[in-house]
């Protein structure tokens, strides 16, 4: 049959048809049914929040930008950080780890390795409370998927928030979230469970990125930290220049600042955050191992600094052992040049998805290339190359992603600024949040941020912090809700209101799960009472959390010891951060000490190690010299201390098993005449069998 339509009308009809189809598609997307609670982020916390919301009888939708559930917990982070305080993990977080324990309690789930030996050595706590904190990624993912299915949660996978216009508001309330695809999800209460805090900008909620200055919250670990990168610092001199010794030749790759001053003054604010990486799941089981291969685009030049560091004497790049069941390991950063990609995350948090994808791809190239460098560069000690050659990617993990984890380790991103800000003072004391919704327990743990060249012309790392909190601490409900004027129906359990320093401890996955369950319970109360999330009664929330077996309080056996501020001490004091030393001296915080830390020599076994304090005295003359140390178990009875006064060395031996006699902190080495203004004290562990401990040296002038 011949058409009677005028051909000139066909383009118009085509346009009308396309418009109609587009409108129809929009209507389909707009037809998503409303939910009581909308959770954005398929992370561990996102799943927990959705499960709790469903158990409370509410309709809930969990929107996951990825196809997978569980975030980092299901993507390689198989060694859970609890700092030894298993008892503070309650509620659904405890249930998660007990489900893991139940899985590994079945002998049929052990295919390689010594199950009984592993359980005694690594997972002995499971016999007491049923929890296992070390697990394979696919097992964690299985638990999350089973949880979601049992709770009949509506899950939307592979939908990413429209970063520009995705948060739809009316006044101070969010009404819906719109995805890149156009799909729109209306709801009553919303929760940001993403690692990036992606709802905060669109919701008009105040937030920050980077490190505050020391002055902002009066935090001693805040801001640029050129002296605090003590845990994974360069221990041997590594030349940073393309042509060794020639600064004019330029910096090697992976070095970011030519001088300390280029980073900013100590304690100043910046927009940088700790490094990201992928937590790799490796195995040494031949039949389950995929060998590490040369990656596409491999460039050994980007690892030249690492090669020079090995040549200088470095010999401990990582610790490979079967820390997870079935002879697998969770490979994390170890040392100043390792799997952490320093400054690789610049631009990630506030970038669009194309930028993020590019940065993620570069992290993969960096880490794959690094492993290949470890295997093949002749400067890497033979025993290390041979050790790594026994390991490879686990064949039964991440099979749909090239056996590579699908979630990059976003250790830190946006942080909300609300009416209550968690700070260093909540973690280290003396402040205590009165409206606890869960406990944190991990030390302040900041991975390195950047590398720089020191005044002597050698490479160092900056930003690394590891400071013990001594005991668990409460986290405030007000820290997970925005200011009322900004948004009345949003809860933020991950990108919560915390300083950079406080977040270093709070950021652990078990805590994320705990806070997310508490957030979902708060959302339930806000729905029941028809009120903003800021107005729920804390007593009512606390009662509900107690019924869910959440742990909200912890009474330590003894008060937290407070560090002694350098500014409070008389005379000239040289702290452990102001020294040069050989090999690794462990940075510690478990006791009373001067400044930010103290050190002990036990790390990679007994070896001759020295710790050298240098002081510039106000003038030559007589000084009393005092030595600070923390009294610990297993200390050395005769630690050799050598004092250089300009008149020859003087060796003094100290019994470190005895409590320090002066203020419980110091022992006097004696009174000495110094011929010049230069004074040196060298601590050694040569010939010792106990642990050598050192903290600070004090020079007190004696009046003539």
Residue ranges and their predicted role:
Residues 33-43:
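Beta1/beta-strand and adjacent pyrophosphate-binding region of the FAD-binding site
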Residues 46:
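N-terminal Rossmann-fold NAD(P) dinucleotide-binding loop
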Residues 562-704:
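Extracytoplasmic
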Residues 28-30:
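Boundary at the C-terminal end of the N-terminal hydrophobic targeting segment
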Residues 1-12:
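N-terminal secretory signal peptides that target proteins for export/translocation
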Residues 58-59, 64-166, 208, 216-218:
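Conserved N-terminal/central alpha/beta ligand/cofactor-binding core
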Residues 115, 141, 175-176, 183-189, ...:
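Flavin (FAD/FMN)-binding glycine-rich loop and adjacent Rossmann-like elements that form
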Residues 15-26:
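Bacterial N-terminal signal peptides
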């Amino acid at each position: 049959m011949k058409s009677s339509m005028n051909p000139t009308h066909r383009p118009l009809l085509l346009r009308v048809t396309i418009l109609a189809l587009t409108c129809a598609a929009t209507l389909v997307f707009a037809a998503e049914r409303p939910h009581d609670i909308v959770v954005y982020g398929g992370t561990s916390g996102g799943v927990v929040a959705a499960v709790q919301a469903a158990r409370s009888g509410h309709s809930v939708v969990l929107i996951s930008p990825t196809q997978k559930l569980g975030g980092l917990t299901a993507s390689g982070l198989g060694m859970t950080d609890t700092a030894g305080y298993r008892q503070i993990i309650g509620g659904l977080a405890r249930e998660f780890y007990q489900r893991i324990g139940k899985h590994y309690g079945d002998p049929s789930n052990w295919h390689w390795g010594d199950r009984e030996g592993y359980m005694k050595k690594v997972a002995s706590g499971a016999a007491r409370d049923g929890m296992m904190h070390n697990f394979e990624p696919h097992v964690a993912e299985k638990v999350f998927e089973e949880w979601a299915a049992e709770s009949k949660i509506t899950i939307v996978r592979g939908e990413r928030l429209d970063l520009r216009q995705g948060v739809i508001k009316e006044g101070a309330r969010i009404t819906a979230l719109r995805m890149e695809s156009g799909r729109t999800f209306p709801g009553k209460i919303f929760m940001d469970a993403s690692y990036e805090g992606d709802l905060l900008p669109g919701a008009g909620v105040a937030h920050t990125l980077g490190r505050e200055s020391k002055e902002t919250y009066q935090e001693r670990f805040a801001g640029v930290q050129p002296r605090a990168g003590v845990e994974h610092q360069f221990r041997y001199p590594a030349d940073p220049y393309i042509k060794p010794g020639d600064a004019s030749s330029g910096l090697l790759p992976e070095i970011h600042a030519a001088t300390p001053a280029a980073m900013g003054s100590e304690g100043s604010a910046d927009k940088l955050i700790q490094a990201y990486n992928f937590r790799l799941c490796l195995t040494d089981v031949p039949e389950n191992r995929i060998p590490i291969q040369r990656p596409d685009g491999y460039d050994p030049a980007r690892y030249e600094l690492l090669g020079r560091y090995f040549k200088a004497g470095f010999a401990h790049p990582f610790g490979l052992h079967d820390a997870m069941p079935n002879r697998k390991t969770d490979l994390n950063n170890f040392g100043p040049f390792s799997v952490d990609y320093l400054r690789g995350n610049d631009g990630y948090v506030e970038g669009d998805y194309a930028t993020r994808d590019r940065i993620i791809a570069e992290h993969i190239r960096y880490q794959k290339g690094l492993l290949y460098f470890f295997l093949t560069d002749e400067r890497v000690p033979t025993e290390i190359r041979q050790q790594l050659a026994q390991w490879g990617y686990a064949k039964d993990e991440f099979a749909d992603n090239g056996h590579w984890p699908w979630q990059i380790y976003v250790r830190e991103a946006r942080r909300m600024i609300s009416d209550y800000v968690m700070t260093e003072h909540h973690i280290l004391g003396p402040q205590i949040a009165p409206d606890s919704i869960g406990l944190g327990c991990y030390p302040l743990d900041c991975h390195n941020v950047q590398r720089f060249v020191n005044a002597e012309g050698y490479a160092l790392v900056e930003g690394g912090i590891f400071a013990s909190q001594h005991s668990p601490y409460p986290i405030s409900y007000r820290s997970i809700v925005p200011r009322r004027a900004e948004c009345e129906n949003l809860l933020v359990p991950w990108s919560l209101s915390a300083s950079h320093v406080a977040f270093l401890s709070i950021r652990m996955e078990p805590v994320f799960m705990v806070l997310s369950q508490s957030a979902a319970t708060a959302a339930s109360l806000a729905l029941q009472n028809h009120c903003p999330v800021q107005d729920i009664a804390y007593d009512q929330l606390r009662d509900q959390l107690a019924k869910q077996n959440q742990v909200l309080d912890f009474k330590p056996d003894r008060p937290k010891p407070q560090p002694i501020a350098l500014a409070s001490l008389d005379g000239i004091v040289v702290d452990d951060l102001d020294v040069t030393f050989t090999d690794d001296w462990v940075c510690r915080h478990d006791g009373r000490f001067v400044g930010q830390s103290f050190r002990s020599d036990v790390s990679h076994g007994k070896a001759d190690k020295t710790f050298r304090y240098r002081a510039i005295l106000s003038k030559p003359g007589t000084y009393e010299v005092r030595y600070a140390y923390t009294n610990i178990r297993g200390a050395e009875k005769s630690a050799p201390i050598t004092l250089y006064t300009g008149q020859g060395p003087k060796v003094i031996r100290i019994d470190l098993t005895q409590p320090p006699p002066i203020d419980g902190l110091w022992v006097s080495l004696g009174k000495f005449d110094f011929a010049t203004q230069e004074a040196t004290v060298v601590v050694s562990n040569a010939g010792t069998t106990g642990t050598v401990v050192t903290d600070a040296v004090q020079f007190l002038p004696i009046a003539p």
